[in-house]
Amino acid sequence: MMQDATDPAVRAALQSQPSGLNSTDDWRQVMDRIMSLTARNPDAFRQQPQANRLSAILEAVVPARANPTHEKVLAIVNALAENRAIRPDEAGLVYDALLQRVARYNSGNVQTNLDRLVGDVREAVAQRERAQQQGNLGSMVALNAFLSTQPANVPRGQEDYTNFVSALRLMVTETPQSEVYQSGPDYFFQTSRQGLQTVNLSQAFKNLQGLWGVRAPTGDRATVSSLLTPNSRLLLLLIAPFTDSGSVSRDTYLGHLLTLYREAIGQAHVDEHTFQEITSVSRALGQEDTGSLEATLNYLLTNRRQKIPSLHSLNSEEERILRYVQQSVSLNLMRDGVTPSVALDMTARNMEPGMYASNRPFINRLMDYLHRAAAVNPEYFTNAILNPHWLPPPGFYTGGFEVPEGNDGFLWDDIDDSVFSPQPQTLLELQQREQAEAALRKESFRRPSSLSDLGAAAPRSDASSPFPSLIGSFTSTRTTRPRLLGEEEYLNNSLLQPQREKNLPPAFPNNGIESLVDKMSRWKTYAQEHRDVPGPRPPTRRQRHDRQRGLVWEDDDSADDSSVLDLGGSGNPFAHLRPRLGRMF
């Protein structure tokens, strides 16, 4: 018997027996254990707190079950030590490791806690469902009570009536913040989802009682429409989203109304033709202003008012990045002589990764703006890079980049348009102008003998020239070219000719033909132009005198100022640099 008691398996089997009352227990033994608590000093036990007395009674009736796990583990460790599987000094370490593993993977407390957690979750879900359906349950009870007062069959449209009642049940069940209640003899449906709306179900069904299955004529629906009350129309509007084309027949009047309400509620997008329609109407009324039209459309379509754009500015970090980019790009441009686009790319490659990662949107926008500025207006790009106080324009922050266009430096950019504007002229003025032009052409063929004649000839052409300021500027400058006069070429240029009067008085019916003949008569062939050009004069020998020595010589090779400045190709332009050798006569 003692051997069975020392056996670990037997001990484990004994300790794993369930505690408490069973078939083998006797109620007399239980009563003896309870009475033994008060046998020694009944008054002392009676004077203890109620919780202590209740705990002692419960422990005496149902003793607590002892946990045999550590005893089993200890028996296993002892058996291992007796069989020399482990050394005695390793018994404590193995015992502790086994207890931890049993507590982790095979613990009754863990399994119990999991079971309790699953039960708690199920209870919470059940309570949530009951809480959510508590209002709908009351509404469904009230709705069933209302439907019990209504007839189950109708004379016409039985299928539509049944489907309508099913849609009503679905609306009461699925619509949040709604309820069905009874007030007096009538039943009401109330919803507060999009404003408080209440429908008297009793009065609505009484109004719809004779309209089930009614097919109104297509042309005249006013007679049937006058039978519906606003209360019934509101019920149809609320129940329309819960119906479809198959539930209620579209041929009936009620089905037609439900379809109209359903399509009106489901159409949430704006018609695409609205903008064109309002634009055409505004133009028909005479409102051609695009700005006011867009503002009106913006208010009509979106019901939004225009806001004043906010002022944008750079913070300290962004301004520091801007100055760094300016210095780096200017250094690349001046040191390496690269193009602006390449300089910007070099600056982007040399930028610190951390700074780029923290300011990626601003740096990308800045580089994009500078690339566009360099492509559209290089001068603006250069000024922006070299200006240490430059800040981006407002369009830089909004995304609408505005780069001023560059000035290409064309000559017509600086000429006043009023020079080419037509001026009213009479027939007498036209004849006087033509005579002056003819006289000026004749004078241009005569070569001036001196510079004084050249200077005197210029003022005569000022009166008839359409550019008196340009001619005056030519004559005011000092020049010694022998073929300086260009009045003939200037006057024969069709682009610089003064505009003639195209529409003369009605006395000249063939004015268009005469102007065409006049233009064709001024045309010259290449041979005529070559023949009309005056030939160059033979070079004259100039004599120089030396009054001190009495020497006179002819200068054949030396070139005066006029020959040096003559770019026509005659003479040696470097002859004045050669030593001067005289010849005595």
From Swiss-Prot:
The record marks S570, G571 as: Cleavage. The modification Phosphotyrosine is found at Y490. Residues 138-251 are annotated as: Binding to hexon-linking protein. The keyword Phosphoprotein applies. The keyword Metal-binding does not apply. The modification Phosphoserine is found at S225, S310, S444, S449, S450, S452, S469, S473, S494, S515. Keywords: Capsid decoration protein, Capsid protein, Host nucleus, Late protein, Phosphoprotein, Viral genome packaging, Viral release from host cell, Virion. Gene3D superfamilies: Pre-hexon-linking protein IIIa. Residues 14-24, 462-475 have a biased composition (Polar residues). It comes from the Viruses. Induction: Expressed in the late phase of the viral replicative cycle. Residues 1-24, 438-475, 528-573 are annotated as: Disordered. The modification Phosphothreonine is found at T274. Cleaved near the C-terminus by the viral protease during virion maturation to form the mature protein. Its main location: virion. It is found in: Virion; Host nucleus. All late proteins expressed from the major late promoter are produced by alternative splicing and alternative polyadenylation of the same gene giving rise to non-overlapping ORFs. A leader sequence is present in the N-terminus of all these mRNAs and is recognized by the viral shutoff protein to provide expression although conventional translation via ribosome scanning from the cap has been shut off in the host cell. Interacts with hexon proteins; this interaction tethers the peripentonal hexons to hexons situated in the facet. Interacts with the penton protein (via N-terminus). Interacts with packaging protein 3; this interaction is required to promote correct genome packaging. Belongs to the adenoviridae hexon-linking protein IIIa family. Structural component of the virion that acts as a cement protein on the capsid exterior which mediates the interactions between the hexons, including the peripentonal hexons, and reaches all the way to the penton vertices. Two hexon linking proteins IIIa, one from each facet, stabilize the unique edge interface between a pair of facets. As the virus enters the host cell, hexon linking proteins IIIa are shed concomitant with virion acidification in the endosome. HAMAP family: ADV_CAP3. This is Pre-hexon-linking protein IIIa. It comes from Human adenovirus C serotype 2.
